[in-house]
Structure formats: structure tokens, C-alpha cells
């Protein structure tokens, strides 16, 4: 179900654009739903099957349980795990601990739950330089156990609390449902001029929203002169520093993150 909800978040804003301008958006932008979500869905399915098998093959075996045994026999097999006075208590606890490591992919997997990302949305290849903010281990496998907050394009916008005029909000709650959000740290160097119908600008710092505990400053991946562009589904689309030519290149950046042309 969670994966299905993620699918909807990914697709609905793309459908809105395709309905508003079919000629412009019915191609690659809609196709990107498959490019982005299919690998995630496949990974979730494989993980779910692994977890299902692990319950029977690892945990049930460690506890000494079996579908072929009677309820009384299963209860007797499990009892030493809970009662240190019974023979085999230490061995049973050790076996369960070993089995639990196998089940960490189900019960201890924040990396899997919130660290997933869309490699196809990393248009400028930033993830290759940082192993996607650490979410990939040195040998290239996905770190299921730990979540590594990152603003590499394709990743979920990290959580941070912000506050303005007595109102506290989660940073992600600032993301509009049908427009991009440009999070900037300064409002005096040109970023606000990039605002348009499809891009809302919010300032975190410099008289705008207050970064309550500094977590956004630690996670944003750019300086306070930089900015992070977020899609309506909460996925980082672009990040960068201000330069004098950015305003001229901005339409190309937007076209790229909308799968309309090559990287700008």
C-alpha cells in the first residue's frame, strides 16, 4: 500500500501537466513514471518476498516452531526463549538474535523506507560523486539499515522544521501540490526573480522561514547563497549556487527536470 501511495505522488502532478498541455508533456514526462517507479516497485516486491521467507526459514527455525507441530509442541519449543531457567535458554536467545539480523531488512530498515531515490532524475550525475549522499555503500549496494538525508537530485527532500511568525511547519509541507518549490537561503541575490506560475520561491533564513534547529542548513547540500528545487512529489529536482548566467539558463533547467531536453 505504501508503494502504491508513492506511485500516486509520483504520477498525479505529471498527469496534471499532461492534461494542461498534452502536446508538451504527454511524452517523456509521463514515461518517467515507469522509469522512476518500476525499479522501486521491483525492489519492494523482492524485499517483501525475502522477508516472508525469512520468517519461516530463519525466525521460526530459530524458535523451533513448525506448522507440522501441535500448538502445545510449538509453545514448548518457544518457552526457553522467555524463561532463563529452562534448558537451552542461552542457545535459543543466540539463535533468535542471528535470525533477527536477517529480518532487519523488515524491522530495521529506514534506508529502505525513506532512503529510496530515482537515479533517472539525477540529470547532472551528482550521485556518482557522493554515492548518492552515502545511501549507496562503497561497493554499490543500497544501505537498507540507515537513511542518509541528501539533496542529490532524485532523492526525497530531507525533513527539517521551519518557523515563521509563530507558525511551525515541516519543510516538506511547504511543497505545493502542483508547482515546484525553490528553497533559497537569500532573497537579495536574484533567486526571487526566478519565481513563476510553476515555481514558488520560499526563503529559509534571511528574514523568511527560520531553520529551527539548523538541520536544513546541515542537509541542504548548498551554501546559503544556493538553492534547492523540489518537485510537487517532494523529490529534489535540482540544486545549485547562484551565478550571473543562471537566470538565462533557468528555462533550460526547468525543461530538463521535466524530461523535456538534455541537461543544461
Segments and roles (model prediction):
Residues 17-264:
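Helical substrate-recognition/capping region of FAD-dependent monooxygenase/halogenase enzymes
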Amino acid at each position: 500500500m505504501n508503494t502504491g501511495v508513492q506511485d500516486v505522488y509520483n504520477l498525479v502532478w505529471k498527469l496534471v501537466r499532461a492534461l494542461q498541455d498534452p502536446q508538451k508533456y504527454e511524452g517523456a514526462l509521463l514515461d518517467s513514471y515507469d522509469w522512476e517507479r518500476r525499479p522501486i516497485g521491483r525492489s519492494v516486491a523482492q524485499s517483501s518476498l525475502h522477508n516472508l521467507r525469512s520468517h519461516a526459514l530463519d525466525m521460526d527455525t530459530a524458535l523451533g516452531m513448525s506448522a507440522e507441530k501441535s500448538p502445545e509442541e510449538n509453545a514448548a519449543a518457544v518457552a526457553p526463549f522467555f524463561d532463563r531457567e529452562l534448558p537451552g535458554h542461552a542457545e535459543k536467545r543466540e539463535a533468535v538474535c542471528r535470525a533477527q539480523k536477517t529480518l532487519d531488512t523488515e524491522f530495521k530498515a529506514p534506508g529502505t523506507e525513506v532512503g529510496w531515490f530515482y537515479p533517472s532524475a539525477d540529470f547532472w550525475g551528482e550521485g556518482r560523486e557522493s554515492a548518492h549522499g552515502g545511501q549507496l555503500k562503497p561497493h554499490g549496494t543500497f544501505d537498507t539499515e540507515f537513511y542518509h538525508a541528501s539533496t542529490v537530485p532524485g532523492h526525497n527532500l530531507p525533513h527539517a522544521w521551519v518557523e515563521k511568525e509563530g507558525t511551525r511547519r515541516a519543510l516538506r509541507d511547504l511543497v505545493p501540490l502542483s508547482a515546484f518549490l525553490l528553497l533559497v537561503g537569500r532573497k537579495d541575490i536574484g533567486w526571487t526573480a526566478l519565481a513563476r506560475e510553476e515555481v514558488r520561491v520560499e526563503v529559509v533564513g534571511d528574514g523568511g522561514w527560520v531553520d529551527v534547529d539548523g538541520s536544513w542548513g546541515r542537509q541542504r547540500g548548498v551554501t546559503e547563497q544556493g538553492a534547492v528545487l523540489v518537485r510537487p512529489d517532494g523529490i529534489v529536482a535540482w540544486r545549485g549556487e547562484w551565478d550571473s548566467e543562471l537566470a538565462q539558463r533557468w528555462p533550460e533547467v526547468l525543461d530538463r527536470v521535466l524530461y523535456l531536453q538534455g541537461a543544461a
